[in-house]
Amino acid sequence: MICTPKVGLNNQLTKVQFFMTKYNFLFKQQVIEFYLQNDKNSSLTRRHFQLAETTLERWINQFNHSGINGLALLGKKRNYSPEFKLNVIQAVKNGKFSAEAACLHFGIANSGVVSQWLQAFEKQGINGLIPKPKGRPTMKLQYPKMPPKPKTREEELELENLRLRAENAILKKLQELNQQKMQKKPLS
């Protein structure tokens, strides 16, 4: 088994490779240091670390724009407000920035995010920029809610009657279960 710099596995028996999709800050720092030590030779750096050209270019641009800390900040998952997304989209649509340049300027990790925002904005307008709820929807309550507090004496008595019926039903069920339990016990 051979581990690659991408924190993956290369099994010689099956010739299958598994790679994690994200790179940690330490690995990015090593790549940038190698790049700078080798006279900014990007092809050598890509071959040495087995990186895609666009990935290396993005890291170099982030490093040039924000320094070494720029690589760490952009790796975290963030939630962006619809207003922020709209500002980025307007900057790209007005020709002020390309998608890549907007990522560097606004501190966004990947230009693919900006492309998704642009598509959503073109299809649905500002509503496409509002985050959708994630996960399973909440379940309905299984039990009915208690009725509101009674306002009159008659409503108060009806509520008390309802409580007593529920209590009576619980006691009957408990008594029935006890009888079934006693019948199942063998006599010793």
Swiss-Prot record:
What residue stretch is flagged as signal peptide?
none
Organism, by scientific name, is Haemophilus influenzae (strain ATCC 51907 / DSM 11121 / KW20 / Rd)
Q: Which InterPro entries match?
A: Homeodomain-like_sf, InsJ-like_HTH, IS150/IS1296_orfA-like, WH-like_DNA-bd_sf
Gene3D superfamilies attached here?
Winged helix-like DNA-binding domain superfamily/Winged helix DNA-binding domain
Which cysteines link up through disulfide bonds?
Answer: none
Q: Which family does it belong to?
A: Belongs to the IS150/IS1296 orfA family.
Query: Annotated region Disordered: where?
Result: 133-153
Q: Name one Pfam family in it.
A: HTH_28
**Which named protein is this?**
Uncharacterized protein HI_1720
